[in-house]
Regions:
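Structural recognition of the conserved hydrophobic beta-strand(s) that form the central parallel beta-sheet
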Residues: 137, 165-169, 180-187
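Conserved P-loop NTPase "ATPase switch" module shared by AAA+ and STAND
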Residues: 128-152
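C-terminal alpha-helical "lid" subdomain
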Residues: 1-25, 212-337
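Walker A/P-loop
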Residues: 59-97, 122
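Pre-Walker A (pre-P-loop) alpha-helix and adjacent loop at the N terminus of AAA/AAA+ ATPase modules
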Residues: 20-61
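Substrate-gripping "pore-loop 1 plus following alpha2 helix"
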Residues: 114-119, 149-177
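A short helix-turn-beta junction within AAA+ P-loop NTPase domains corresponding to the substrate/partner-engaging
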Residues: 195-209
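Short glycine-rich substrate-engagement loop in P-loop NTPases that contacts/grips substrate
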Residues: 93-128
Length: 337
């Protein structure tokens, strides 16, 4: 069965709560009060937005998550939609709408403005009417609500102004007409976002790089996940002192880099790559000393025969299929030289 075509600018659409969205919230290690504050803010909009819209200080249902890359903002935003949907499940389903802001800029004068107006005035209201609750996730929102005061050096500052004006107008209209719609946005560059957009936010939450204790918790969580597939790894996840020592080697890393350290550890030795159950802390420490996956090539590597010996003929494949004409031409050219 063919998947339905999504409207322009819509990256994905999900109906929540759904089991396959459960992991995102727990995957990001942040203080408990951070998650509680985010969930509380989401419920205020999704559950009480219509009543609160009668107040003089109109809520905009807008949350901005700001911080360096790899700090878990987007994953946490998706997880927030799921846990909010779980909290509101008795009152009806929730739609999670992910927007691709990079689809809106256009070289044609005024086209960016029209695209944004179409999204905010037509697409989102139409989708929001389907279910009681709607969460709209906009990643890298700085490309959607460009800071107008810095647009004088842009190729087309007039269009930037018009597009950002359209964002403000659309956000205001949705806040008035659909006050139970929650916008969760993320940015790596908060100074690139228009001041008027930020002033409309009900919550701006800044994320920093993880401290040593948080890094240790991320490492432990990652090892526990690995142990689900290879139970022999579980003792590593329980060795708190070793984990804390490893965390000290990861100072200044973001959460994504810390999680990828486990993958880098698996790739330090061929024995471990073949059988991850043989993973040792020394593999992880070696990977950490090399800054995860960032390494310089050293001496000449051994040949494949030195590594694996002769491969039996019955395991080898013919070399006479699976290539296009260019491949044949390349080999003919080499033979002629």
């Amino acid at each position: 069965m063919a998947q339905p075509t999504l409207p322009p600018g819509v990256l994905s659409m999900h109906v929540l709560p759904a089991d396959h969205h459960d992991k995102d919230w727990d995957a990001i290690i942040v203080p408990k009060q951070v998650k509680e504050r985010l969930l509380s803010q989401a419920l205020v909009t999704l559950k009480h937005g219509r009543k609160l819209s009668q107040l003089a200080g109109l809520p905009h249902g807008l949350v901005v998550l700001a911080g360096p890359p790899g700090t878990g903002k987007t994953t946490l935003a998706r997880g927030l939609a799921q846990v909010a949907a779980l909290a509101l499940a008795k009152e009806g389903a929730t739609t999670l709408l992910e927007i691709n802001p990079h689809m809106f800029p256009s070289d044609m004068l005024g086209e960016s403005q029209r695209n944004i107006m179409r999204l905010l005035q037509d697409t989102i209201p139409e989708i929001a009417a389907r279910r009681p609750h709607t969460v709209v996730l906009i990643d890298e929102v700085e490309s959607f609500a460009v800071r107008r005061s810095s647009a004088s050096f842009e190729t087309n500052p007039v269009d930037v102004h018009r597009a950002t004006d359209a964002v403000m107008l659309g956000i205001d209209e949705i806040a008035k007409k659909l006050p139970s719609v929650l916008f969760v946005t993320t940015t790596n560059f908060i100074t690139a976002i228009d001041e008027a957009f930020l002033s409309r936010a009900d919550l701006v939450m800044h994320f920093a790089l993880p401290d040593p204790a948080t890094i240790a918790s991320i490492l432990q969580h990652s090892l526990e996940e690995l142990a689900v597939q290879w139970p022999a790894v579980l003792p590593l996840a329980k060795a708190r002192k070793d984990i804390e020592a490893l965390a000290a080697l990861c100072s200044g890393w973001n959460g994504r880099q810390v999680r990828k350290l486990i993958l880098a550890g698996l790739a330090q030795r061929l024995e471990v790559a073949k059988d991850p159950a043989q993973l040792k802390f020394e593999d992880l420490r070696e990977a950490a000393r090399k800054k995860g996956g960032v390494e310089w090539a050293g001496d000449a590597a051994p040949s494949s025969k030195e590594l694996f010996g002769e491969v039996p003929a019955e395991l080898k494949h013919d070399h006479d299929h699976g290539h296009g004409e260019d491949h044949d031409h390349h080999h003919k050219t080499r033979r002629m030289r």
